């Protein structure tokens, strides 16, 4: 028997078995489009997969959603993705990105928004809130008491302050001319009569003798006349009395020793309570107007820029980003731990993954599908191709043996 007759079946079987997969794939996809002769379409055109690409897409989508991307698997993927460390890193990144935007081109826009918020808060919201809050008896109670206890109760004038205040009082309030005029205003006929009668009736001993024998009416009347008629001389006498009696020194020492701590405890408590009531009534009556005036007078635009730039340079802000990110991530983790399954069930219909798969397969051309499948076969299923060649070779050997035996 001819040697080539025995050798040809194994060779042919090997070639056919090795290239059968490529031929089968080509037969599934080609021709890519229908071929027409006249108005009649040739049978088996286009290929099996191009002709049924929509059905293939739906089957692929059903298989993936039913076996691979089940709600349970998506939930597991979400749990891996939404680990606390990853959430914290994402939140921190978002916060840093937000502050980077503030520091960049968005600074003026952010400052404008902040200025509008502060202006509305000071001019509109805060006045209404103060009007409501001030109706309560405890409005600013702790704050006012703290100011009273730590500031007013311990307040005392220093020696320099007492000296300055004394100089001002003697130069402006207690001048000789003002004292002379006050004496004239006080020594009216009625007041002189009252003083004279009181001294006659309520004194005793030597004072009674003086009051009843001599009286003070004439003396006080002459004093008033002296102050009226001898203005310059009266002022000079009063100035001499101020110097002789050391009024300046005594007034300075009195001011220097003036303190609320020298008052009785009951009086201090009453003053403390009255101070709070005065502050509360002021805010109740005029607090809204005060806040509106502040809201209109403050340059909120410049203030907002200053606040933002201060925040940008603040180390506290940088250190607090980590704490804020951690707290928000823990809060979100607790929420997701409880409601993740419910969220996934709501998200899947919204994402419409099955429709995405169908559209992606339908939008992929038959040529691209063929290349993808051939790439999978060559890269991942090469053993099947090799097995086809081996089986073809074995079949060819079997045929050669049969021919040899015959």
From Swiss-Prot:
Main location, first listed in the record: membrane
Recorded superkingdom: Bacteria
UniProt KW Ion transport keyword: no
Chain ranges passing through the membrane: 384-404
Localisation per UniProt entry: Cell inner membrane
Membrane topology designation: Single-pass membrane protein
Pfam families assigned to the protein according to its UniProt record, in alphabetical order: DUF445
Gene Ontology CC entries for this record: plasma membrane
Keywords for the protein's UniProt record, in alphabetical order: Cell inner membrane, Cell membrane, Membrane, Transmembrane, Transmembrane helix
Similarity-based family: Belongs to the UPF0754 family.
Descriptive protein name: UPF0754 membrane protein SYNPCC7002_A1087
Organism: Picosynechococcus sp. (strain ATCC 27264 / PCC 7002 / PR-6) (Agmenellum quadruplicatum)
Phylogenetic lineage: Bacteria, Bacillati, Cyanobacteriota, Cyanophyceae, Oscillatoriophycideae
């Amino acid at each position: 028997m001819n040697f080539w007759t025995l050798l040809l079946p194994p060779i042919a079987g090997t070639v056919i078995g090795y290239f059968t997969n490529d031929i089968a794939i080509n037969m599934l996809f080609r021709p890519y489009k229908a071929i027409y002769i006249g108005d009649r379409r040739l049978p088996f055109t286009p290929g099996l997969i191009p002709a049924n690409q929509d059905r293939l897409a739906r089957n692929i989508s059903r298989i993936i959603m039913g076996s691979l991307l089940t709600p349970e698997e998506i939930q597991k993927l979400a749990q891996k993705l939404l680990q606390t460390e990853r959430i914290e890193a994402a939140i921190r990144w978002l916060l840093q990105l937000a502050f980077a935007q503030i520091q960049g081109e968005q600074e003026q826009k952010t400052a404008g928004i902040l200025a509008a918020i502060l202006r509305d808060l000071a001019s509109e919201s805060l006045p209404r809130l103060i009007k409501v809050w001030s109706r309560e008896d405890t409005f600013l109670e702790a704050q006012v008491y703290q100011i009273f206890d730590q500031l007013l109760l311990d307040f005392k004038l220093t020696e320099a302050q007492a000296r300055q205040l004394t100089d001002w009082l003697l130069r402006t309030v207690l001048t000789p001319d003002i004292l002379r005029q006050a004496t004239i205003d006080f020594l009216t006929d009625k007041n002189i009569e009252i003083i004279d009668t009181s001294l006659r009736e309520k004194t005793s001993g030597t004072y009674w003798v003086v009051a009843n024998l001599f009286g003070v009416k004439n003396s006080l009347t002459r004093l008033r006349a002296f102050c009226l008629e001898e203005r310059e001389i009266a002022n000079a006498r009063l100035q001499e009395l101020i110097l002789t009696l050391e009024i300046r020194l005594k007034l300075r020492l009195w001011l220097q020793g003036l303190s609320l701590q020298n008052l009785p405890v009951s009086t201090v408590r009453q003053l403390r309570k009255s101070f709070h009531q005065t502050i509360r009534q002021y805010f109740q009556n005029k607090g809204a107007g005060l806040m509106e005036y502040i809201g209109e007078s403050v340059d909120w635009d410049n203030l907002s820029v200053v606040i933002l730039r201060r925040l940008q340079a603040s180390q506290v802000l940088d250190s607090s980003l980590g704490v804020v990110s951690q707290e928000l991530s823990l809060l979100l983790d607790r929420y997701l731990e409880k409601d993740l399954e419910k969220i996934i069930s709501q998200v899947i219909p919204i994402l419409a993954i099955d429709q995405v798969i169908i559209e992606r397969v339908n939008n992929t051309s038959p040529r691209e599908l063929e290349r993808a499948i051939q790439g999978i076969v060559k890269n991942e299923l090469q053993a099947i191709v090799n097995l086809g060649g081996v089986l073809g070779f074995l079949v060819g050997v079997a045929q050669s043996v049969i021919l040899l035996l015959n």
